[in-house]
């Protein structure tokens, strides 16, 4: 049994890694949820029992319905080869309706945008716990500027260790997060023991009443703060590929109990200390419920938990981007697999981008209070889009229509209420995540629909049969009218069904300056689900100089095409599949393999293309994004090989039949 299969089973190690990777975001919500609710209602001096009981009831039932029911019980069943998240969900249902791509694009863009705010708000909140704390005669963190500096240092270090992989990080974070959740539960129950009557918050009636009660000064807008308790639910779904759903389902009950106890404990403390710190703007009930002799320990533990919360979003972002690339929502990117688990990935470009944006957000908002005002808006949009896709998934699984409609109406109503309340955050900072999400959405829209238009309008003869050109290529190899371009000309070209190839590849060989070579190689790289596969198959179509190579490489294998190809050439020469390539001038006596020239073809829009203005803009924007983001030489491990990048005209749509009219020569008269 291989590792991929084993990972699906629940184990103690798997549970520990799940606690370390998946629950960071939702596990740090107690740091700021009650603080936000109290602050929005005018501070601790203005709260009463009805507000606290109702608010905690809202929190408990929000986490129950959205996280437990929707994500743990329903969404985790909707995995695509073990991977979760909104893009994996879309991949499962996309054949049911073309329009489903819209919620997938919107939800994915919003989730990626929200991932830039989570690290900033969680780390800043935890470090603010140190602000003005005295150690003897010293105050190490006397101002918000020092908080910002420490926060940025922590974030930069966090992003720097991502290349180690989630397995290594999870093993380190798992035990710490287990301590964190246990600490939340113990502190919560210690404070709750002073007022067990607060357990009445379990009754959902209190949650409904507080929305219209005069004790709640912000009305339905309180949901904007309550929603912060469940923002990590979508990240939980996105991270399932890193730890498996069995380990998430097995660990969630303990996490849920610890979170619930902590919220109840904070509520109990607030009710018994209404006049405490009434004028302190930095008041945070999370740290106040902790005994003073444990305050420093709580802050240190909260800081580490905040770092892990950031990790949950970062790993989820890597997964989302990889899935987006495979679905042609985003350009291809360099993906690194730090472990033997295919679901555990690292994308250097995305890591750098999230790091830069997150640090910029810390500088822009400066305080956790301002960040909380912007937090959660984007994720409500993602949750709504996930609900739409889950409705279709349930239909695919044959669930009765009435159950699907109940599911859709119930969760769309709940999430719609949260969205309405979160919209008030737009002018207070929510616009930042909206702008980031909009930017990502534009890129994904252009890439996806640019590809769609290209595929739809591409000439019918865009693909040709390679075996129909073998005779012409053989003749070119022996034609002395042309100089030898290279001994081996290699095209990184996907050969479909072992015979179809894009015409532009043959155009590069034949229609431009003909490339005479001893052998023509067409190499296709296929990535397998096994980590260390290294196999190849060849088809020469009955020739000695036209070779279709299918490389099958495990996801952890380096794609060093030039290294593999030299071995393949030696083996094919040895068994007589191709002719030897003896070198007259060489520093290696007996060398029988010639030089290699790797050709990578890039598209440019041809003047012959005839598209509508919109179609032309989309295709040109898509080509521009491709040229901006891609480095094919690094994809294939050809950085140090003889690589040529050629531009080949891309002809789309109907050709213009006539450009200029021929006339008879005009007689010229002397002046």
Curated annotation (Swiss-Prot):
What is stated as this protein's family in its record?
Answer: Belongs to the HAK/KUP transporter (TC 2.A.72) family.
Pfam families in the record, alphabetically? K_trans (PF02705), K_trans_C (PF22776)
Q: Where is the signal peptide?
A: none
Where does it reside?
A: Cell membrane
- From the UniProt record, list the coiled-coil ranges: none
Q: Which residues cross the membrane?
A: 12-32, 56-76, 99-119, 139-159, 172-192, 218-238, 251-271, 296-316, 345-365, 374-394, 400-420, 429-449
The answer on whether this UniProt entry bears the keyword Ion transport reads: yes
Keywords of this entry: Cell membrane, Ion transport, Membrane, Potassium, Potassium transport, Symport, Transmembrane, Transmembrane helix, Transport
Swiss-Prot/TrEMBL catalytic activity: K(+)(in) + H(+)(in) = K(+)(out) + H(+)(out)
Principal place where this protein is found?
Answer: membrane
Question: What is the protein name given in its UniProt record?
Answer: Probable potassium transport system protein Kup 2
GO molecular function annotations of the record: potassium ion transmembrane transporter activity; symporter activity
Superkingdom, natural source: Bacteria
Keyword NADP in the entry? The reply is no
According to its UniProt entry, the function of this protein is described as: Transport of potassium into the cell. Likely operates as a K(+):H(+) symporter.
Query: What is a single cellular component term in the Gene Ontology annotation?
Result: plasma membrane
Q: How does it sit in the membrane?
A: Multi-pass membrane protein
